[in-house]
Amino acid sequence: MPDREKAHARIEALREEIRHHNYLYYVLDRPEISDEAYDGLFRELVRLEESYPALITPDSPTQRVGAAPAEKFLPFPHTIPMLSLENAMSEAEVFEFARRVRKILGDRGDVDFMAEPKMDGLAVELVYENGELTGAGTRGDGYVGEDVTRNAKTIRAIPLKLYAGAGGASPPARIAVRGEVYMDRKDFAALNRSREQAGEPLFANPRNAAAGSLRQLDPSVTAARSLKAFFYGVGEVSGYRFKTQAQTLEQLRRWGLPVNPLSRVCPSIEDAVSFYNEIAAGRDALPFEIDGVVVKVNSIEWQEMLGEKSRSPRWAIAYKFSPHQARTRVLDIKVQVGRTGVLTPVAELEPVTVGGVTVRRATLHNQDEVERKDIRVRDQVMVRRAGDVIPEVVEVIGEARTGGEEVFQMPGQCPSCGSEVVRLPEEAVHRCLNRNCPAQIKASLRHFASRDAMNIEGLGKNIVSMLVDRGIVESVSDLYRLSVETLEQLPGFAGKSSRNLVESIERSKKTNLADFLYALGIYHVGSHVARLLAERFGTLDAVRRASVEELMSVNGVGEVVARSVVHYFSLPANRTLVESLLSAGLEMAATEPEAGPVDAFWNGKTVVFTGALSSMTRSNAAALTASRGARVSDSVSRKTDIVVAGADPGSKVEKARQLGITILDEREFLERLGM
């Protein structure tokens, strides 16, 4: 047999053997060989493919890593929308869900359920054609996500080719499988240790780490992050039909896709609640983070009969865990200054572990919130991760006070620039009005360079601080005058890093109107509103000349947003900034209309906000939802469609539950905004 034929036969044998061991390791959790033996097989395959490059195929295990970094993510449309789930926070709500299911199904027989741990990761959809992985996308807004195919192929838990040799049916001609990419606790801790040693910012939790790792423009970064995945369902399928959710999971497992081994068929809703209690009791001992249990009607036929509501299926519910809480001490209260000049008090805490995550600080929102909760320096407090993600101070332990606690008072001068701090009558926040405030300049630069704005890679927090503190950059327009020689003078900024940043800044000159408008940081103009304006007016000049009435004629743009845009372009300093950017050579391509019904969730809905939001003011949140076609109301009634609940929401949430109104916590609210 010629050498090439021998090599071909050995390559095929090695690929099949490696796929087999991947299946045993990632799906069955029963490895048969040591890591060293596996590495030996992999290295042999690499050597053979290097010797015979014509024999390399896209589904080879060696092809997971190596693609060049992309400049941006392409859209990934979902043929069947990836809906979110209705939440339940109590047994009563789960039993009510089961009652609704039985009412719709009538006397068709006893209903059994599939109960699955709710992974706290990033939702993804993988597309396999004739068994080979051809596409992968994030959930996005449920209709269109981001194409992360190249990155998904670097995750060893995701098979490049579905495994048909473990029994059961062969893979269909085309199937879209859905699941969660996650990072387990051990790998998360190791990643943060390495980032701390390198002087890089730490990830707040494993979910953020997983999302940030998958959504990398450079696949080699994703490959180095030890991501894993569990799969729980399917979207589009051709030529194949599943009978039950349990069968779906088993068949996915047989094809080589990891499924959560803790999932269980429950003959009754009472059994599903018992499963929840069992999982909740042992959640901290699991190697990965979960934030609840998803309960699904097991029969696929009955799922189809039950159908969907506008945002969620009627046949499933997410029974969420109560937030983790822990006791700690307030060491200090520091004030942060944002890009719009808002001063936000932040509690510096004695490090405490809350739900597997070390919490060192928590936002206190504003002076009113500090006074309402009476939070003082050196207080003993209870801290929780709201939505199991955002740290917040729940309450002060009053009986632990010794008399040595200090009352917090918002400073009269900006901690960054020393300018007078003001509180406008209609706002709950204090502001620094100095446009030359270093903290605001730094925050504006980070916003301008962010992925959804000018997308300048390499312009991180540390380099921004050095540029501003040394007086090299005083405005975003100064970025376009940076040279390699200037950057090389900064400590730790080697030649390659300097060249890469200058090249990234140069690439950002080719942008579009929507991204540019968002990058300017106009009050109330998020990325979605910026796109609406770009699609309606087409050019920057047209937006600058538009009146309040003309802006309000855009569907999704209200009076608050319109006046903010007009005010921005009326200020001489802003007009000078825009002209400086244009003079630097920025070129704006036409903005294409958005793909898919991205406003379907908010459009026409009546929304009520209650409680404090940590990520923005309620007025900003109201403006964002209004810009998407929603109507914001102050009171809950039968006409209310959605209640957004922040910290300490009060009676509105209970009334919403009684009326069966959809309730979103802050994390879900941000996800629905695509933030």
From Swiss-Prot:
E.C. number(s) listed in UniProt: 6.5.1.2
UniProt keywords, alphabetically: DNA damage, DNA repair, DNA replication, Ligase, Magnesium, Manganese, Metal-binding, NAD, Zinc
Superkingdom, taxonomy of origin: Bacteria
Cofactor(s), by name: Mg(2+); Mn(2+)
GO BP annotation list: DNA repair; DNA replication
EC class name: ligase
Binding site for Zn(2+): C414, C417, C432, C437
Single GO molecular function: DNA binding
Function: DNA ligase that catalyzes the formation of phosphodiester linkages between 5'-phosphoryl and 3'-hydroxyl groups in double-stranded DNA using NAD as a coenzyme and as the energy source for the reaction. It is essential for DNA replication and repair of damaged DNA.
Family: Belongs to the NAD-dependent DNA ligase family. LigA subfamily.
Name of the molecule in the record: DNA ligase
Organism, as annotated: Syntrophobacter fumaroxidans (strain DSM 10017 / MPOB)
